[in-house]
Amino acid sequence: MNLRKNFLANAVACAVAGITVTAQSQELTKSLAPVIVTADPFGASENAMILAPAKVLSGNELRNKLGSSLGDTLGSELGVSASEFSTGASRPIIRGLEGPRVKILQNGMSTGDLSAISNDHAVGSGMMSATQIEILRGPAALLYGSGAIGGLVNIVNGRIPTVLEPRATGEAELRYSTVDQGTGLSFSADRSAGNIGLHVDGNVMNAGDYRIPGSSAVDSSNALNDTGKLGFSRNRENNIALGSSLIQDWGYIGASLSQLNKVYGIHGRDELAKIDLAQTRFDVDSYIKSPFAGFEGLRVKLGQTDYRHTELEDGTQPHVRFSNKAFESRWELTHLPIAGWRGKVGLQTEHSTVQALNLEGEDPTVPRTRSQSTAGFIVEERDFGDLRINVGGRFESVSRSPLDNTKRSFNLGSYSAGALWSFIPGYGLGATASVAQRAPTAEELYSGGPHHPTETYDIGDPNLKKETSKNIDISLQKTTEAFRWKANVFQNKVKNFVYGSLSPAVQGIADGMEFDRTFTQADATLRGAEAELSYNYYDPGWFGRIFADTTRGTLDNLGNLPLQPTTRKGLSFGYQDAQWRSSLSVLHADRHTRIASTSISEETPTSAYTRVDASINYVQRYGTTDVTWFLLARNLLNEEIRLSTSLLKDYVPQPGRNFIVGLRTRF
């Protein structure tokens, strides 16, 4: 214990010592100014969005928190945890909801991957290419899908230029991590040629098996128990994208083409596996100013994705190949104010073909299923003095057409209304109520085969009903001056909540599976609270933050929901000026004992942990070029960390102590 205290004291000293450079207030304030939430229909800043609680990561904050997956990057944000199946596959969990209930977007369009099906599937968007990541809840989520009852995450990488750069701009980054001997290189560049905007970006990442504090399995007698290093935790990725736009006074039209390749290992309970992923994506984005009388602008987006991944037993034997071919279109009209109301109306269509073929000649894990969706939506906002009202609605028709099974159709209606009272300048009290409906996915309806990475035999139910969520969210927030704070409480009641009930394998015995996972339904309730206090985040000098969040999810008459986040408390502090930024953060997660009933899950309690991270950034300026040298430290105490939200927590701990060193340049 004394060793840990001394280590922590030394870390604090290293994080803040020697910082004596005179602050250049205007430059720092400009670089730390609140950024616009691109997924918000009204283009609000993060601090202005009390009705739709939001968090935006960008700039150095994003680069310092950047992980190998989306869940790893966002897992310490307020109200957000991570599924953490492996270093290559981890999705964000928002207020206890995950999978298809959390929509993942790239530049406002669906990623087109299959990460919502299962926790072992990666998000189809490279983290190293992201320039901004937005977490959004509330009425704005209705623009992107009725199923996003938990919220949405939008990954922004600016691949289609929307403005003409007067000179070439860009950035590049090189980093090395000690825990896995990992290397990462990313770059992006923009320039213009006349009225043509040009963009290119790419990244390469290669990480080996990562070191762990002790043994991988809680039960040391496990046949796949590793000590000191976790086998099959390697992670490789490469990503390249090109984009171009015609930009004129009337607006713009542009397109981008990208290719993502990713190979990552999965260290399971009784099996080792590898996933080999490839995704090709083509996007079109256009905006026309004042297209008709009474309208401010028309935005049209098109996206086509060809996604596939192969699951390999023991890293060599192909077993199942998942694929998804998807096309999406979005049409948004922004109208001029009508009787003080401002807003958007739009249309969204989605077409996809999903299948999971068993390469050993057995029945498909998921049969070839064609899904179609057509939706209309509207979001409106108006100020009445100190009171702001926000309303939205979405009406959607969804069909699932499987090969050799029952076709299902669903009519969905989702509504949201909120009010914000600015009772004192800089303070706001907000309340939002919403009803949202979600259609079961093809996997929930029609699965019928083994899934080796999760060691389950998945069994769908073609008679599942649509989910209906009723959510209430109350927020209180202070958004000005040095001390800022916010607090939220929420309740979400979900009728016909779809979940996978685990039981000892019967149908899966012949395939060597540990469990049968049967998709079924029950009513569920999720409640929680979040609070955060920050000091001086937008000015030079000392800054700090403390926060806490908690969520409780239950199935009516069946006990706790499985794999729920535990209560967390955290603090961070540091110093910043125009050249230096240093910080130290501590996150404590309580022991998790509110586990699911053994009749629906084999869940076990999770031990408490304390994670300590630190960072130092130093900026050198050469004309219009900035060079930032950085040193990041993660899990400084080399704590054994297991997440209550991870299906493999008893077999796959988080990485041990890790130092990341690198540099990035912006020009």
Please state what every model-predicted region is.
Residues 70-73, 90-93, 102-105, 120-126, ...:
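N-terminal periplasmic accessory domains that precede
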Residues 343, 383-389, 482-486, 490-494, ...:
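Gram-negative outer-membrane beta-barrel transporters
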Residues 110-139:
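Short acidic/polar hinge/loop motifs at secondary-structure boundaries
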Residues 272-291, 322, 407-408, 414-418, ...:
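Outer-membrane beta-barrel signature, preferentially recognizing the C-terminal barrel domain
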Residues 208, 213, 437, 495, ...:
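C-terminal beta-signal and adjacent terminal beta-strands/loops
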Residues 33-65, 99:
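N-terminal periplasmic "start-of-domain" segments of outer-membrane beta-barrel proteins
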Residues 167-173, 177-180, 184-277:
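Periplasmic-side early beta-strands and strand-to-turn transitions of outer-membrane beta-barrels
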Residues 233-235, 250-298, 304-326, 361-364, ...:
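Flexible loop and strand-edge segments within Gram-negative outer membrane beta-barrel domains
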